[in-house]
């Protein structure tokens, strides 16, 4: 059971956010604001969403991309972070699991996810 004051505060925080609907298995592009000294830039991080966890303002999602030399790079993003400028869903994946950690052991074409066909 959650505190009603915390729930009302979180509800006010979540109202003004424009976050698309996505699930584990979807390919997403996350535009992250990075501050380097006095400069600020936006870096795109594109990969497969392999997990979503938490609730309310503490909700996070994990994105896995294949880096150089076929090395997998995973990054955890807070969903309602101010450093996230935008989230774009590129592909909807067809999976039957909520957490896709089994993809860590797969390599090459075996690690692909089928695209969800729209009716």
From Swiss-Prot:
What GO MF annotations does this protein's record show? structural constituent of ribosome
Residues passing through the membrane, by range:
none
Q: Which UniProt keywords apply?
A: Ribonucleoprotein, Ribosomal protein
User: What are the BP-aspect GO terms?
Assistant: translation
Among InterPro entries, the record links this protein to: Ribosomal_bL19 (IPR001857), Ribosomal_bL19_CS (IPR018257), Ribosomal_bL19_sf (IPR038657), Translation_prot_SH3-like_sf (IPR008991)
Q: Which GO terms describe its cellular component?
A: cytosolic large ribosomal subunit
Q: Which Gene3D superfamilies match?
A: 2.30.30.790
The similarity comment for this entry is: Belongs to the bacterial ribosomal protein bL19 family.
Q: What does this protein do?
A: This protein is located at the 30S-50S ribosomal subunit interface and may play a role in the structure and function of the aminoacyl-tRNA binding site.
Name assigned to this protein: Large ribosomal subunit protein bL19
Q: Could you tell me which species this protein originates from?
A: Sulfurovum sp. (strain NBC37-1)
């Amino acid at each position: 059971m959650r505190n009603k004051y915390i729930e009302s505060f979180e509800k006010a925080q979540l109202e003004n956010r424009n976050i698309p609907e996505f699930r584990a298995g979807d390919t997403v592009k996350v535009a992250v604001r990075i501050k380097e000294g006095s400069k600020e830039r936006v870096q795109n991080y594109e990969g497969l969403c392999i997990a979503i966890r938490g609730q309310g303002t503490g909700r996070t999602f994990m994105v896995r991309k294949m880096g150089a030399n076929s090395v997998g790079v995973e990054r955890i993003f807070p969903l309602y972070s101010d450093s996230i400028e935008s989230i774009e869903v590129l592909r909807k994946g067809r999976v039957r699991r909520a957490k896709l950690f089994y993809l860590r052991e797969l390599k090459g074409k075996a690690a692909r996810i089928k695209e969800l066909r729209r009716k």
